[in-house]
Amino acid sequence: MAYGVKIAKGDAYKRAAIKRRHIRIRKHISGTAERPRLVVTRSNRHIVAQVIDDVKGHTLASASTLDTTIRGGESDKSAQAKSVGALVAERAKAAGVEAVVFDRGGNQYAGRIAALADAAREAGLKF
């Protein structure tokens, strides 16, 4: 394999494909101080969004379904993703970030990923 990810069967194959796509995406996407990278990490149960300055290697803002403000709220995972998107946008704007580069993390831009991105846009982040 060109990207060094071992191919397996079942769920391991799906995770390897996501990892392979994320490596390919990261070749073209990088966050700077002016436009940091909004990276979304998704599991079966939770979703995490981080605003990262890749030049310095610092996380400027983050939000997750594990945050106490979101945890125990909506039971629908798409609604939780919307809450995470709005919260990460609010925290990013508090850190002085207005525009970001969106990194979907190798996942399809649909469902929870799209819900998070739409909520972040509605909250004022530009991408």
Curated annotation (Swiss-Prot):
Gene Ontology biological process terms from the UniProt entry: translation
**Pfam families the UniProt entry points to:** Ribosomal_L18p
**Sorted alphabetically, which SUPFAM superfamilies does this protein's record hold?**
Translational machinery components
Q: Which GO terms describe its cellular component?
A: cytosolic large ribosomal subunit
This entry's Gene Ontology molecular function terms read:
5S rRNA binding; structural constituent of ribosome
**Which keywords accompany this UniProt record?**
Ribonucleoprotein, Ribosomal protein, RNA-binding, rRNA-binding
Q: State the oligomer form and interacting partners.
A: Part of the 50S ribosomal subunit; part of the 5S rRNA/L5/L18/L25 subcomplex. Contacts the 5S and 23S rRNAs.
Function text: This is one of the proteins that bind and probably mediate the attachment of the 5S RNA into the large ribosomal subunit, where it forms part of the central protuberance.
The protein's matches in HAMAP family, at most eight in alphabetical order, are given as: Ribosomal_uL18_B
Question: What family does the Swiss-Prot or TrEMBL record give for this protein?
Answer: Belongs to the universal ribosomal protein uL18 family.
Protein name per the record: Large ribosomal subunit protein uL18
Give the source lineage, highest ranks first.
Bacteria, Bacillati, Actinomycetota, Actinomycetes, Kitasatosporales
